[in-house]
Amino acid sequence: MPQLQYPECYLAPNRCLVSNCGVNKMSNEELVGQNHGMEGEACTGEDVTFSDVAIDFSHEEWGWLNSAQRDLYKDVMVQNYENLVSVAGLSVTKPHVITLLEDGKEPWMMEKKLSKGLIPDWESRWENKELSTKKDIYDEDSPQTVIIEKVVKQSYEFSNSKMNLEYTEKLEGKHGSQVDHFRPAILTSRESPIADSVYKYNIFRSTFHSKSTLSEPQKISAEGNSYKYDILKKNLPKKSVIKNEKVNGGKKLLNSNKSGAAFSQGKSLALPQTCNREKIYTCSECGKAFGKQSILNRHWRIHTGEKPYECRECGKTFSHGSSLTRHLISHSGEKPYKCIECGKAFSHVSSLTNHQSTHTGEKPYECMNCGKSFSRVSHLIEHLRIHTQEKLYECRICGKAFIHRSSLIHHQKIHTGEKPYECRECGKAFCCSSHLTRHQRIHTMEKQYECNKCLKVFSSLSFLVQHQSIHTEEKPFECQKCRKSFNQLESLNMHLRNHIRLKPYECSICGKAFSHRSSLLQHHRIHTGEKPYECIKCGKTFSCSSNLTVHQRIHTGEKPYKCNECGKAFSKGSNLTAHQRVHNGEKPNSVVSVEKPLDHMNHYTCEKSYRRETI
């Protein structure tokens, strides 16, 4: 293992923490301005423990990181542990968090605060040895920048010298500055934009002023204080590429100064290479490659459907422990993240971030095929699958494939019959929370989506889009069998089942089969007698919402179906269809039934035909 050399400013007064560093005696005036007059001492591996170099995240901070940043964190933690073992030997006990990371599990990280203590004056000296930097595309207060700085900074400190000093325990003597419980910024609501520019991860220029405290945890720099790192500058690709590559394969996260070139004020610094791991572990299902076997094992759960983490409240299972942790918040009802614009609260910071884009309206990611814009690059990636018709997620029970993994999870609940979301008003259960939210609007009569043509309001956006096709009469989806057109692709797919006679949904009571699941649910209410839809005007109840909608037109007088020939309007589409036969001269019931002749035939024997058969 090559010997590491360090600048003098890394060495604390009174002690030399690096073996054979070549510095036998140092000037006290140069380091701290005080006359202690002590020789440097060689240290052992016991001077540094894993807790000195461990990187702790709170639950909120961990939830903010994307997959690439989490992979970077895991690599740094393992690298720190390996460096510690190489220095201290096999006597080091493997920490529990390392075991979790090697097994591909999510770490349970708790917040870690530094105790009040003394800060060495050599940190202020380090401030004078600034490196030239370029303007960063990120604000230095950016939450994501802070988190990544935190990971790489601690790895850098340990890789340099196994001397990650704790201000209260590692230094002797008295110094002027103190820090009160410094910890990284609590992530709030901002997701940093990512562009084709240089990210600069500023590392290790800690500057504190006398008797200053970081009293605002939401900010990484306060008035008179700064926490900046200026050693490492890293070029990263676009955010969409980060999802597939943790770092550019052939480049080092920390530049190694093997040639002994001058560092800072004439001192050399050699840094070990980290995060230069090849992706040799390939998934046999989808071909995605990973740098570690443990990460591949965790990814494999997507294909196998393995979910080892179970919620004790509702029995729902998850593939990762972090997902279970986020889910538990839904049971507690806690919503600590509040939007400052409208006051709406959320249980997860990611949900707040997504919500705030509705206020700003910013959508920087545009689809090159159709021009549609999105606020997040992940939404753009999902949207592109619509154009490519790529369906990666397949149901192992019925073989149906889906573009999105969330759609597969939703679909699988049809087979399991799982309905964990129950309405408190009527007790009806649903398989997903969005269906429950939409159902609850029946009780609250909340209708927030308004048609700009007829001013009719709807409880969901999908209903509004479906309604607007009445005004436009646009039906781009045509059946190749009968040339019937539809305004939605889903309606066409449902219609095609009529031609192939596919009826996969069978009633468990009478055995009758149906082409659509919705038809089965509606039929099942005949056996149960359930009529959940009630008219608020007269109290009449109905088994399906469409019948209630048609009935309400009696009270409102609405007649949306208008004849183009004579202008007559009708409340039902079927009535309009029957009326149009008058203009077309159609008489479909001219054929007389042998078993039950028409009542009119009992008195007349003429050849006149009738549009309707009366029995």
Curated annotation (Swiss-Prot):
Q: Where is the KRAB domain?
A: 48-120
UniProt-recorded Gene Ontology molecular function terms: DNA-binding transcription factor activity, RNA polymerase II-specific; RNA polymerase II cis-regulatory region sequence-specific DNA binding; zinc ion binding
> Where is it found, in Gene Ontology cellular component terms?
nucleus
Q: List residue spans of C2H2-type Zn fingers.
A: 281-303, 309-331, 337-359, 365-387, 393-415, 421-443, 449-471, 477-499, 505-527, 533-555, 561-583
Please give one Pfam family short name: zf-C2H2
Keyword DNA-binding assigned: yes
SMART domains cross-referenced by the UniProt entry: KRAB, ZnF_BED, ZnF_C2H2
Is Chaperone one of the keywords? no
Crosslink (Glycyl lysine isopeptide (Lys-Gly) (interchain with G-Cter in SUMO2)) position? 153, 170
State the protein's name.
Zinc finger protein 181
Say which species the protein is native to: Pongo abelii (Sumatran orangutan)
User: Encoded by which gene?
Assistant: ZNF181
